[in-house]
Amino acid sequence: MNVFVENDVKIIEMGDKGPNLLSVERAKQLIKELDYSDCKAVIILGNDKVFSAGLNLKDLSNAKEPKEVALIFNTLGELLRACRDFPGPVISIVGGHAIAGGCLLALASDYRYGMHGMHRMGLNEMAIGIDLPPDMLSIISHSISRDNLFEVVTQCKMY
């Protein structure tokens, strides 16, 4: 991850040429950057192909204990709250796909800018058997119109 400050704006480049998966480690790094910032705004960037493909499903499948699964989801929840609680605007520049947890990260931001291209954005959790916790549903319902909420969450429609 590459972090720098320009004109009181913290710019966080998730910095991987791949899917920018939100592992517990990466989520904690992002939380730290959001929690300890004296900047006026934060910009979060992925790469030109993928903003973030969400949680690392290998981490979930390798979790042996319920507490390990809880740690993964709780850390993602903390990251989303850190975006919401940041005193200035958090801006996600979505230059590529934003799927599942990556879409949640973009939705938790105050502003989302989609870059030109054939990229997908959506929540596929229900399609793969993952129930969204209430705090994540709250973020979604504050960011997506009521007209589209059902198809986004339960039908996993991609945009």
Predicted segments with their positions:
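Conserved CoA-thioester-binding segment of acyl-CoA-metabolizing enzymes
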Residues: 1-45, 81
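A short, flexible beta-alpha/helix-coil linker loop
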Residues: 16-19, 60, 119
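Short glycine-rich anion-binding loops that position phosphate/pyrophosphate groups of nucleotides
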Residues: 17, 48-50, 96-97
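Hydrophobic alpha-helical membrane-association signature
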Residues: 26-30, 72-75, 105
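Catalytic-core regions built around general acid/base machinery
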Residues: 33, 75-87
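Hydrophobic/aromatic residues within transmembrane alpha-helices
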Residues: 44, 56, 105-107
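Glycine- (often His-adjacent) and acidic-residue-rich active-site loop
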Residues: 46-79
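Crotonase-fold acyl-CoA enzyme core
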Residues: 82-159
